[in-house]
């Protein structure tokens, strides 16, 4: 979710204010790397506002930074219900309204309201051409328009996939405070380790809505602890 989507509470209405330094040093580096180093073809707008404007229509975030500074020429798309306007969204650089909480498709911001905005001169055809170009560019790069170049059947749940997800999870962990130098654990002085709480035995990959997956391979925290240190210390579990 681009960008500064840092809380779930009131995430569709909250107006985030942060300093330029915090924006550049904390919230944007991962997106910048995904675009410039990873070659991301699509970026999804966050639900929240940033400095008074929703992220789907935020000219500073999308037009100035994402497109002009980083050189992103792919598709900028909303999450479901993240669009709030027609003209500001077009001007900021939103390409695709993925879904909107409006009953009729023809009433979505990029449906009849967009047609009327073009007819009335509020939106120039050059902006429409820009959006079409972004979508076609991604379709060409992913071989959607050329069946002969489409990727063949892929693979699922390979050892390489499992290792990649393991590495991503391990490298994403950030230790905020190591009080009294508790870590790393000194097993020469520890006889047993208590793991307390239901989440230690639960698998966590299954979220809701679009984040729901059926993981074939997943390691619970308790399983991981026992696999890593089970031969050094007695690891005991309690539901709590």
Residues covered by each model-derived region:
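Glycoside hydrolase catalytic-domain context in secreted enzymes
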Residues: 1-240
């Amino acid at each position: 979710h681009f960008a500064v989507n840092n809380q779930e509470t009131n995430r569709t209405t909250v107006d985030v204010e942060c300093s330029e330094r915090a924006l550049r040093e904390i919230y944007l580096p991962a997106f910048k790397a995904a675009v410039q180093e990873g070659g991301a073809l699509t970026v999804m707008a966050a639900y929240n506002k940033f400095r008074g404007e929703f992220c789907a229509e935020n000219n500073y975030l999308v037009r100035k930074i994402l497109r002009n500074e980083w050189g992103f020429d792919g598709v900028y798309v909303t999450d479901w219900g993240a669009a709030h306007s027609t003209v500001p969204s077009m001007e900021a650089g939103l390409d695709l309204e993925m879904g909107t909480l409006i009953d009729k498709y023809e009433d979505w911001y990029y449906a009849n309201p967009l047609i009327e905005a073009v007819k009335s001169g509020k939106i120039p055809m050059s902006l429409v051409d820009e959006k079409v170009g972004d979508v076609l560019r991604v379709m060409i790069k992913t071989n959607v328009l050329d069946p002969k170049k489409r990727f063949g059947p892929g693979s699922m749940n390979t050892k390489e996939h499992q290792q990649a997800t393991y590495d991503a999870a391990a490298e994403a962990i950030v230790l905020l405070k190591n009080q009294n130098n508790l870590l790393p654990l000194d097993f020469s002085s520890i006889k047993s380790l208590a793991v307390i709480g239901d989440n230690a035995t639960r698998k966590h990959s299954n979220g809701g809505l679009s984040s729901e997956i059926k993981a074939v391979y997943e390691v619970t925290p308790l399983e991981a602890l026992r696999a890593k240190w089970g031969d050094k210390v007695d690891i005991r579990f309690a539901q709590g």
